[in-house]
Amino acid sequence: MAASATFYRLLSRCGKAARSRPLGARCFGVRVSPTGEKITHTGQVYDDKDYRRIRFVDRQKEVNENFAIDLIAEQPVSEVQTRVIACDGGGGALGHPKVYINLDKETKTGTCGYCGLQFRQHPH
């Protein structure tokens, strides 16, 4: 019983609070390690005796609380009419190189490899 509870806590981002939330709800806030240090989007956290903690002796570790992967996951799947869609990430200087995504595969949704946006062909 205790092992399954620990496993469930490790899988969920927010620990015990995740059980009471609906599946689509987002956990606001930053994950914190047992030492009280904020965990970055890459999972970077240092032990108490790690020499790399010297960077944060007189300063607080600044972590952006809006992880990009979480923000992209909140975007709804876009319904399109064509079977091939071109994604350029919004275009202009803020976009990425144009990629063409084939939507008639078995997965039924196509994901852009650059920005993570998802597309689905609208059935006619």
From Swiss-Prot:
A single Pfam family, by name?
zf-CHCC
Q: Name one GO cellular component term.
A: respiratory chain complex I
Q: Where in the cell is it found?
A: Mitochondrion inner membrane
Please give the residue positions where the record annotates the modification N6-acetyllysine. Answer: 98
Please give, as recorded in its UniProt entry, the membrane topology of this protein. Peripheral membrane protein
Q: Report the protein's function.
A: Accessory subunit of the mitochondrial membrane respiratory chain NADH dehydrogenase (Complex I), that is believed not to be involved in catalysis. Complex I functions in the transfer of electrons from NADH to the respiratory chain. The immediate electron acceptor for the enzyme is believed to be ubiquinone.
Put simply, this protein is called: NADH dehydrogenase [ubiquinone] iron-sulfur protein 6, mitochondrial
Organism of this sequence: Macaca fascicularis
